[in-house]
């Protein structure tokens, strides 16, 4: 389960790390220099995806090993603009799995409905470390925001998870994003982290999108074509 304090306070407005300390309005130029700002309430790397489209598809390579202390690891995408969203994975150290995570605007994980696969990818189960998951995010599907995950759980089950938050009614957005972060409600100085991930074959509305590096805060972000790799390392 998500730590209750994680979504309270400062994170309520910023979602997780959906916005940085210095806001970047609208479309980001590919010539924009990598931001020097720190992420709020944690550390990590972020790339923006210059598209205001409706459907994102990507394959995410989950870390085979995740070493994090004094914080919670996340790997996620989502959209920014009129509504901020974080959609992807939260690491469970207790079960050594990556659990589905979803937040859209003010609606959080407690309002997620699992339309398929909930018993195979939630509670004590989740996505297997080291596996590849295909993630599809629908910004607005009949007034709802939906995420579809195709992957393998920690018991070896291969299948689909469909998660949805209803009545989000998302309108226009300015961009999408890809992040790997460690969030904390305490001091960011105390965080220790070592994990890596990648988003490959990123498309939005069936068009390949080249990520633009935004933030590297105790992180290394590398772009290749329509793919991006992120490593979050802090000793």
Curated annotation (Swiss-Prot):
- Signal peptide range in chain numbering: none
Q: Which domain of life is it from?
A: Bacteria
Q: Which cysteines are joined by disulfide bonds?
A: none
What the entry lists under Pfam families is as follows: YrpD (PF15493)
The UniProt similarity line reads:
To B.subtilis YncM.
Name the chain's protein.
Uncharacterized protein YrpD
